[in-house]
């Protein structure tokens, strides 16, 4: 930049009207300061001695004569000055051209000051931006350091240092103080404690499905416990489970383990051990005092009620409308329930009775029924109460209860794939009793509540998805030796919180024989009706 200022001063001195002063110094200086090509230097040398005019008309002929601008004007118009600025600016922005002298390429001896000022301003702006970015990086780096430091000793030292210069206004420590204080307010130990307590509370109140399956197995009452009112009551009731129920569950588990050990001792080594691993330990025998009460009573906790379901197709109409019978799968084979499909019904309608010889609706032994929709993919289980739509009764207890609802969904894998089932049942109270659900109209039933996702006081169960076996070429489930033949009707119903806790299991063992095992909180009537729903044809599913 200093060289350019000197050249500009010399050029302006040559253009001014002083002839005597300009001729003597310019003649020796121009050949030294202009190491231009030979052709351009010749033009300059011929012009200088011929007419040393003060106006400088001859020096402007090669470059400025074409544009027609007089060089005497000290302040050219901005419009005229901007035209050569674009060409000169391009030259200045070229990194290689900056190293050269502009006088080597341009014959014009005068360089515009406006372009130099713009270039300097651009460089200054770039420098300022770089400095600003460096300052920002320097400012942002210090607060990151306290976040990385986790040791308590360093935090204590920093506290002491931070408390000292509080009165100094010019100290650079105050800006990072809030970050350090925030980290100190919530130390790692206290945060983990709070989170642990929250997780414990949520596990006790809401019973998250991520909980351990062992705890779900030990307390099936808590898994199926619901409140009759708001969810807050439900959480309180789940927290306050009686200790007596827990003791009973522990005693039942101990009894089951004792039975397992006694059975294994009596068996010989070798094959007996393999069978013991495959099959479940037999549950203690279930006593049936009164059939009506037993059929409606939930299964005892910690026990599996094993039953056998048989189908009778004999007779003229038995092929289309067979009868079904349920017995306990024991040596005595105690009869529990019987069911048949009604003939003059628009939809699938099964009557369930506790008398195998009298399957009429008007009999005293009528205990419940199973009814489906037109498509045959949704079923509802009722007891023997009164229908609220046919005859209104002032006594609410006489109205029928909805004991269960079964929904069959179309499988994604095609018609030959496994079925998808959803079972809705009433929840259980703290006294291990079923919550009564007596809808007074069709818009308050289990299916409508399930569609509207208002599942208060209800429990939603699903079938356990089977696994494809390449060796057998079919979908398989582990029935623990209770099912021997493949069938679309084979299924296992489980709870989402504990997939290993099988609430209901149904499968084929012969052409007209099936096994039916159910556990708490189901009763025999619910299990039998759910199994009957699998026999009916489903237009939307298969």
Swiss-Prot record:
It comes from the Eukaryota. InterPro entries: Tubby-like_C, Tubby_C, Tubby_C_CS. Pfam families: Tub. Keywords: Cell membrane, Cytoplasm, Disease variant, Leber congenital amaurosis, Membrane, Phagocytosis, Retinitis pigmentosa, Secreted, Sensory transduction, Synapse, Vision. Residues 91-104, 146-157 have a biased composition (Basic and acidic residues). Changing residue 459 to K: In RP14; no effect on RPE phagocytosis. Disulfide bonds: none annotated. GO terms for cellular component: axon terminus; cell projection; cilium; cytosol; extracellular region; photoreceptor inner segment; photoreceptor outer segment; plasma membrane. Retina-specific. One of its GO terms (biological process) is positive regulation of phagocytosis. Residues 262-275 have a biased composition (Basic residues). Residues 114-132 have a biased composition (Acidic residues). It is linked to Retinitis pigmentosa 14: A retinal dystrophy belonging to the group of pigmentary retinopathies. Retinitis pigmentosa is characterized by retinal pigment deposits visible on fundus examination and primary loss of rod photoreceptor cells followed by secondary loss of cone photoreceptors. Patients typically have night vision blindness and loss of midperipheral visual field. As their condition progresses, they lose their far peripheral visual field and eventually central vision as well. Homodimer. May interact with ABCF1, PSIP1, ZEB1 and HMGB2 (Potential). Interacts with DNM1. Interacts with F-actin. Interacts with TUB. Interacts with TYRO3. Required for normal development of photoreceptor synapses. Required for normal photoreceptor function and for long-term survival of photoreceptor cells. Interacts with cytoskeleton proteins and may play a role in protein transport in photoreceptor cells. Binds lipids, especially phosphatidylinositol 3-phosphate, phosphatidylinositol 4-phosphate, phosphatidylinositol 5-phosphate, phosphatidylinositol 3,4-bisphosphate, phosphatidylinositol 4,5-bisphosphate, phosphatidylinositol 3,4,5-bisphosphate, phosphatidylserine and phosphatidic acid (in vitro). This is Tubby-related protein 1. It comes from Homo sapiens.
């Amino acid at each position: 930049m200093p060289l350019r200022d000197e050249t500009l001063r010399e050029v302006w001195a040559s253009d001014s009207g002083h002839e005597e002063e300009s001729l003597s110094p310019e003649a020796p200086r121009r050949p030294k300061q202009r190491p231009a090509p030979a052709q351009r230097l010749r033009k300059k040398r011929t012009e200088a001695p011929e007419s040393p005019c003060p106006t400088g008309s001859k020096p402007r002929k090669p470059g400025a004569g074409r544009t027609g601008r007089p060089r005497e004007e000290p302040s050219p118009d901005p419009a005229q000055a901007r035209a050569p600025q674009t060409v000169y600016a391009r030259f200045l922005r070229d990194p290689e051209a900056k190293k050269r002298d502009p006088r080597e390429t341009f014959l014009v001896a005068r360089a515009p000051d406006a372009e130099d000022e713009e270039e300097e301003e651009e460089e200054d702006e770039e420098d300022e931006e770089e400095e600003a970015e460096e300052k920002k990086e320097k400012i942002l780096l210090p607060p990151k350091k306290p976040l990385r430091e986790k040791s308590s000793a360093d935090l204590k030292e920093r506290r002491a240092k931070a408390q000292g210069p509080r009165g100094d206004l010019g100290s650079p420590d105050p800006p990072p103080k809030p970050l350090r204080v925030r980290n100190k307010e919530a130390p790692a130990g206290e945060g983990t404690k709070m989170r642990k307590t929250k997780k414990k509370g949520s596990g006790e109140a809401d019973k998250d499905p991520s909980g351990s399956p062992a705890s779900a197995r030990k307390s099936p009452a808590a898994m199926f416990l619901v409140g009759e009112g708001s969810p807050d009551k439900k959480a309180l009731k789940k927290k306050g489970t009686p200790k007596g129920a827990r003791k009973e569950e522990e005693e039942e588990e101990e009894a089951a383990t004792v039975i397992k050990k006694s059975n294994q001792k009596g068996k010989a080594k070798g094959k007996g051990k393999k069978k013991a691993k495959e099959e479940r330990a037999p549950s203690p025998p279930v006593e049936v005092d009164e059939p009506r009460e037993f059929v409606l009573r939930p299964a005892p906790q910690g026990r599996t009620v094993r039953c056998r379901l048989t189908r009778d197709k004999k007779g003229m109409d038995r092929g289309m409308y067979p009868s079904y019978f349920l017995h306990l799968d024991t040596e005595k084979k105690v009869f529990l329930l019987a069911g048949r499909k009604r003939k003059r019904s628009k939809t699938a309608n099964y009557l369930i009775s506790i008398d195998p010889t009298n399957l009429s609706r008007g009999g005293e032994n009528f205990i419940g029924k199973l009814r489906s929709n037109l498509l045959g993919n949704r079923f509802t289980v009722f007891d023997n109460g009164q229908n609220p739509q046919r005859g209104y009764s002032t006594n609410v207890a006489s109205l029928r209860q909805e004991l269960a609802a079964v929904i069959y969904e179309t499988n994604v894998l095609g018609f030959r794939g496994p079925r998808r089932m959803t079972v809705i049942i009433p929840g259980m109270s703290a006294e291990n009793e079923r919550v009564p659900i007596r809808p007074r109209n069709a818009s308050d039933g289990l299916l409508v509540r399930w569609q509207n996702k208002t599942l208060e006081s209800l429990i939603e169960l699903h079938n356990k998805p089977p696994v494809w076996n390449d060796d057998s070429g079919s979908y398989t489930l582990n029935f623990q030796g209770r099912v021997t033949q493949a069938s679309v009707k084979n299924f296992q119903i489980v709870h989402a919180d504990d997939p290993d806790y099988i609430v209901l299991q149904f499968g084929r063992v012969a052409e007209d024989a099936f096994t039916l095992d159910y556990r708490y909180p189901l009763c025999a009537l619910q299990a039998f009706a759910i199994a009957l729903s699998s026999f009916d044809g489903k237009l939307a599913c298969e």
